[in-house]
Design a protein with these regions (language model features):
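Eukaryotic cytosolic "membrane-facing" regulatory regions
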Residues: 29, 41, 45-46, 53, ...
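Alpha-helical repeat/alpha-solenoid scaffolds of the HEAT/ARM/MIF4G superfamily
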Residues: 1-6, 13-22, 38, 138-210
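Hydrophobic residues within the alpha-helices of tandem HEAT/HEAT-like
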Residues: 65, 79-86, 101-105, 114-125, ...
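HEAT-repeat alpha-solenoid elements in large eukaryotic scaffold proteins
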Residues: 15-44, 70-82, 97, 107-121, ...
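Core helices of alpha-solenoid repeat scaffolds
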Residues: 4, 50-58, 90-99, 111, ...
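Flexible loop/turn segments at the boundaries of HEAT repeats in alpha-solenoid HEAT proteins
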Residues: 45-51, 85-94, 123-133, 178-187
Length: 210
């Protein structure tokens, strides 16, 4: 896979934007951004080099999501979405992204952006499989149920909760369609290793409910 220079320029710009937002705080994240930019520059020098995204390139976003600062997390999720859309995530990195999203759901941070990222992650490729595929569905169900398990007097006053719930419901419908498409494909080629319908039902997803 050849990576075009304009795409690499966009990715470098995202890291610079995150670094600027950090100001003088979070030195490790700034250093991670600088390291990622250097790695991208090396790739820019030879466009024939295949870019197999690794921990160095997602690390700035991982660290930023751990800060619990909404502005940094929002920027990071948008950056991750671009990496996904450009087909730059390998399997290991994609699973790290799922774990990041899980932690954000647990802490009720940027839920709408999390749902958007899940959609991009599962509709752009077929890297996410097995337990991590089930986990993405569980996250969506949890956010959908948020409207029902939260005190209704609070829901009535907080439109954001209702918006999150309705967005999660729409996301679930879309992801179920994706899962069934994979099931149909698996019936043709059972060696692909995608999460089968039976395994999805049998999987102990209850342990992920928050």
């Amino acid at each position: 896979m050849k990576i075009q220079k304009p795409i690499l320029d966009v990715l470098q710009s995202d890291y610079r934007g995150l670094s600027t937002e950090l100001k003088k705080k979070y030195v490790p994240i700034k250093e991670a951004c600088e390291k990622a930019i250097i790695k991208l520059r090396e790739i820019c020098d030879d466009l024939n080099i295949s870019l197999n995204i690794g921990k160095d390139l997602i690390l700035p976003y991982v660290l930023a999501c751990e800060t619990k600062q909404h502005n940094l997390i929002s920027i990071s999720l948008m950056g991750l979405q671009k990496l996904i859309l450009y087909q730059l995530l390998n399997e290991e990195s994609s699973y790290i992204v799922v774990d990041i999203l899980k932690n954000l759901v647990i802490n009720s941070v940027e839920e709408i952006r999390v749902l958007q990222t899940i959609i991009v992650l599962l509709t752009s490729n077929q890297i996410i499989k097995h337990e991590h595929l089930a986990l993405t569905l569980v996250m969506c169900f949890n956010l959908n149920f948020k409207n029902y398990i939260t005190d209704q007097s609070i829901v009535a006053k907080d439109k954001e909760i209702s918006t999150i719930s309705s967005t999660a419901a729409a996301t679930i419908q879309q992801l179920i369609s994706v899962v069934f498409d994979r099931i149909s494909f698996e019936q043709i080629d059972p060696n692909k290793g995608y999460l089968s319908f039976d395994n999805l039902l049998k999987y102990k997803i209850h342990k992920y409910f928050m």
